[in-house]
């Protein structure tokens, strides 16, 4: 009987395992950490009872994922919760760009820029599932929705700073630029509009929800579904050589490419090993968790209701800071993402103490301390927040890499998002999941479609393995 082993119990490893198990393949998942989840783990990092997401926090692509939507994970305890305001981007003037799930309400809030917002996002939202069905697959495939893909591609190929010229107000331009900055790539480069378009449209199509009880609920539900299908998960098992798993007919590796090359050793063709070791990792995150009494006192009222905030000032300021981190320098005012998941999910708080999530974009492997720079950015738009902080927990890039080995140098996107690598990750190949070793596949976020808690990397890789078994 065909047997499969999955190395790594992050969302993509579990997605691969579930996909194989659905086809009757016995699956064992081996996870080095004491708990499953990879980047979706949730911890009481600051004070007992306060739930902080360790990395992945807000999930616009999860509800859009064809794989996750097919599983009915709510049956296994997953509950999605939405904040009143999905995203806010405050400016020094006291105003803010505000993303709501309603396209019309968002456009209305942008005033004179509302019609242009509708023109850009209306068609994409109307055909969002068709676009997702294309971009969540490998680049080399026969499109089922070519017109929808083409319409998306026209804008996606542009630098974010160029596409943003369709809006005149600082609020609309900053709102789009902050979302585009999720790509960890200079906004004046080609293809940076793609992230901004996809995540903003996801907000209008599905919202930017959080998982009740923390992001761990997503992978806990995946694990429950796998167990229901007869799969097995073993934690605290570090796989250090291919020989430990070579007995399996199918091996799925939820690993960074360099780690996969090291694991497979001489079994991997030299040309593939060279490509994997040359795989480029991008800038890092510097993350802090805060316990804040009474919440963050944002100057802008919409920010007090927002589940996610982007702190970086104007589009031009964000473009400058992203350029700086790519040059290896920490800006005085780095781009910061703040999560207030407790607004949608009060179970994460204890009384008047609330967990606040924040990370800054910093250079790859940044060895310094960005804690005060992050708090300064929050204070910039919420004067007095320092006095409300009662506890903090810090994860530097090196500590993020220790927490999750796929985050090489603190790169939580599991790879640089330059256009060539986005198109051809993790190497030039007809099958991006094949490692060159028979029966062994890479299924991490280093494969298409890339980062995000959507499980599609694992799903696609498992589908590749199943085709080879036929």
Where are these regions (language model features)?
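Flavin-binding catalytic cores
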Residues: 116, 295-296, 329-331, 366-405
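Glycine-rich phosphate/pyrophosphate-binding beta-alpha loops
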Residues: 54-61, 181-185, 285-287, 344, ...
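Rossmann-like flavin
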Residues: 92-191
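Helical element adjacent to the flavin cofactor pocket in flavoenzyme catalytic cores
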Residues: 198-240
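N-terminal glycine-rich phosphate/pyrophosphate-binding loop and immediately adjacent elements
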Residues: 2-130, 416
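A glycine-rich dinucleotide-binding beta-alpha-beta segment and adjacent secondary-structure elements
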Residues: 173-186, 333-337, 384-448
């Amino acid at each position: 009987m065909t047997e499969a082993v999955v190395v790594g119990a992050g969302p993509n490893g579990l997605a691969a395992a579930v996909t194989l198990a659905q086809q009757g393949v016995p699956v064992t998942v081996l996870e080095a950490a004491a708990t499953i989840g990879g980047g979706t783990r949730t911890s009481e990092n600051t004070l007992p009872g306060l739930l902080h997401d360790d990395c992945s926090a807000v999930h616009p692509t999860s509800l859009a994922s064809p794989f996750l939507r097919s599983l009915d994970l709510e049956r296994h305890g997953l509950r999605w919760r939405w904040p009143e305001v999905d995203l806010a981007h405050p400016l020094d003037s006291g105003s803010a760009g505000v993303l709501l799930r309603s396209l019309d309400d968002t456009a209305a809030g942008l005033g004179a820029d509302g019609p242009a917002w509708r023109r850009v996002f209306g068609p994409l939202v109307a055909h969002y599932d068709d676009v997702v069905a294309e971009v969540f697959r490998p680049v080399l495939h026969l499109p089922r929705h070519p017109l929808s893909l083409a319409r998306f591609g026209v804008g996606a190929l542009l630098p974010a700073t160029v596409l943003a010229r369709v809006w005149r107000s600082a609020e609309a331009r900053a709102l789009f630029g902050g979302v585009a900055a999720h790509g960890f790539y200079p906004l004046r480069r080609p293809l940076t509009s793609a992230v901004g378009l996809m995540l903003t449209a996801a907000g209008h199509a599905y919202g930017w929800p959080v998982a009740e009880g923390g992001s761990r609920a997503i992978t806990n539900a995946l694990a429950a579904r796998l167990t229901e299908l007869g799969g097995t998960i073993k934690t605290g098992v570090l796989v250090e050589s291919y020989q430990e798993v070579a007995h399996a007919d199918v091996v799925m590796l939820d690993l960074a490419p360099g780690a996969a090359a090291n694991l497979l050793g001489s079994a991997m063709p030299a040309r593939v090993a060279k490509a994997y070791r040359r795989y480029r990792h991008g800038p890092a995150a510097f993350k802090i968790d805060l316990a804040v009494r009474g919440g963050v006192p944002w100057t802008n009222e919409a920010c007090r209701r927002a589940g996610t905030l982007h702190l970086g000032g104007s589009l031009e300021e964000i473009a400058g800071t992203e350029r700086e981190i790519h040059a290896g320098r920490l800006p005085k005012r780095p781009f910061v993402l703040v999560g207030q998941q407790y607004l949608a999910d009060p179970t994460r708080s204890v009384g008047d103490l609330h967990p606040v999530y924040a990370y800054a974009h910093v250079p790859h492997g940044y060895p310094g301390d960005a804690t005060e720079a992050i708090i300064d950015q929050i204070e910039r738009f919420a004067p007095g927040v320092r006095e409300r902080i009662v506890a903090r927990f810090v994860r530097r890039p090196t500590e993020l890499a220790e927490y999750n080995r796929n985050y090489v140098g603190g790169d939580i996107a599991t790879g640089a998002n330059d256009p060539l690598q986005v198109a051809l990750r993790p190497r030039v190949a007809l099958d991006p999941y094949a490692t060159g070793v028979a029966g062994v596949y890479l299924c991490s976020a280093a494969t298409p479609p890339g980062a995000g808690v959507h499980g599609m990397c694992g799903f696609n890789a498992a589908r590749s393995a199943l085709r080879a078994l036929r």
